[in-house]
Amino acid sequence: MANRNNVTEFILLGLTENPKMQKIIFVVFSVIYINAMIGNVLIVVTITASPSLRSPMYFFLAYLSFIDACYSSVNTPKLITDSLYENKTILFNGCMTQVFGEHFFRGVEVILLTVMAYDHYVAICKPLHYTTVMKQHVCSLLVGVSWVGGFLHATIQILFICQLPFCGPNVIDHFMCDLYTLINLACTNTHTLGLFIAANSGFICLLNCLLLLVSCVVILYSLKTHSLEARHEALSTCVSHITVVILSFIPCIFVYMRPPATLPIDKAVAVFYTMITSMLNPLIYTLRNAQMKNAIRKLCSRKAISSVK
């Protein structure tokens, strides 16, 4: 296989080849990346430092924010630095690392969002059993399952891609390495592999998305027996979670639940689910959550007081 693989690096065309647009891309995506990192790190620090945020919901939210920070760091820094240069290349091993990182963190996030939906279901539909069911060791186990599941998903994907022969061309019409862009460059028949990718990525996204939507429907149906205040709080939680699910899953389903072909819109979709979603998630979960907003205010005021002293 090594003799058939003559490609040592790939050329990335990026979002655009227009020099003026590349300067705009540098500024815009630098702002997006910085905001995403600040927002997600702020949530992790706030939850870790706030005794009032010790429930399983915030435990999972802290991990989700950590994953979002990691996920946005897989491709965004290279996109930003590449916008400063005319020639955009990535080594073969670097390309494989990008693919692994992207699918690892995305796989962890997909499973963790499903875990969070289960947590919401138990909290709203079975409140009397919540502390019994969602014990600390159970929460830690569920997070561990998310990490293992993401690792297995990414490992399976990368093992198949690494075995493909790349004889040239080596030009990728994208700003990052992704499965479909790579298998289209392979000098062998990849039809079966394309179907496998659709099953391993697209079908998993679709299945988890349906499970999440069903859980939300069950939760909303059960709210008719709750008080008005409880309904409002539960509805706010569900709306935030449904919004994040839609932002995370719809692009995944669009990209992978189709034949292995690259479309012009794929770049815009990739920007959305690799960068924009990671920036929006902290806003979605904090703007509608009074406890999070209060905890952030207390943390900021504490830091301000300590800096004055």
From Swiss-Prot:
Annotated GO CC locations: plasma membrane
Keyword Signal recorded: no
Residues on Cytoplasmic side: 48-55, 119-137, 218-233, 288-309
Membrane-traversing stretches: 24-47, 56-77, 99-118, 138-156, 194-217, 234-256, 268-287
Domain of life per record: Eukaryota
Disulfide topology: 95-187
InterPro entries referenced in this protein's UniProt entry, alphabetically: GPCR_Rhodpsn, GPCR_Rhodpsn_7TM, Olfact_rcpt, Olfactory_Receptors
Membrane-related topology note: Multi-pass membrane protein
Keyword ATP-binding among UniProt keywords: no
Glycan attachment sites: 6, 87
GO molecular function, one term: olfactory receptor activity
Stretches assigned to the Extracellular side: 1-23, 78-98, 157-193, 257-267
Pfam families: 7tm_4
Localization terms from the record: Cell membrane
Job of this protein: Odorant receptor.
Record family assignment: Belongs to the G-protein coupled receptor 1 family.
Official protein name in the record: Olfactory receptor 4C13
Lineage: Eukaryota, Metazoa, Chordata, Craniata, Vertebrata
